[in-house]
Curated annotation (Swiss-Prot):
This is Ribosomal RNA small subunit methyltransferase Nep1. Belongs to the class IV-like SAM-binding methyltransferase superfamily. RNA methyltransferase NEP1 family. Homodimer. One of its GO terms (biological process) is rRNA base methylation. Keywords: Methyltransferase, Ribosome biogenesis, RNA-binding, rRNA processing, rRNA-binding, S-adenosyl-L-methionine, Transferase. Gene3D superfamilies: 3.40.1280.10. The record marks R59, R100, K103, N107 as: Interaction with substrate rRNA. Its EC number is 2.1.1.-.
Amino acid sequence: MILVLAESALELVPREIWSHPAVVADARRRGKKPGGILLDRSRHHPAMAVLLDSRRRGRPDIVHQALLVFQYSLLAARGLGRMYIHTLGDYVISVDPSTRVPKNYNNFVSLVEQLFATGRVPPEGRPLMEIRRQGLRDLLTELGGRWVVMHEAGLRIPLVQLGKEVLDSVVVIGGFPHGDFNNKWVLEEAAARYSLGEVAMDAAQVACRVVAAAEAAAGLL
């Protein structure tokens, strides 16, 4: 299974709010420049009101939680899965299945800031994470051009059946806190849309259930 966390709320602080007191104070506290730190609503909320589509931005924690679910899964450990993160700003982060993402959130933030600065981590040797400019459509085409989407308006099927459907598929989950996909074609052109119920779930909750279903289908549980 290939998991794609799409339109994720992960980005560096944009230039238009570099001079905001909340951003300046956070950057100074961490000994970094304003443009070199991750946008985080929990720290930069007062500054984010001027940003376009601000409700969908500044949530690195969503990416962190989903990564923890996938990277520590049996799928990843057995080499049966891989995860990609597509950001709202059209960057793609590829994650090696062997990568052990920091469980501490602050350490994760520092790692991703380094990734944005250097393009890969670690800087030398075999990369565990790499980042590049790439749109979502290009990524999905690169991965075979066929995908399924987890979406509350999709078809609800038993978890046993879901596991069989997603085990060998590219699975797209939204990495944003509110709303729906900006790229409507993701839903319209998907091979299938599946739901875990009528209630919208956090990305990590969806990832957890999808991963567990795939693990069961693979005979790992």
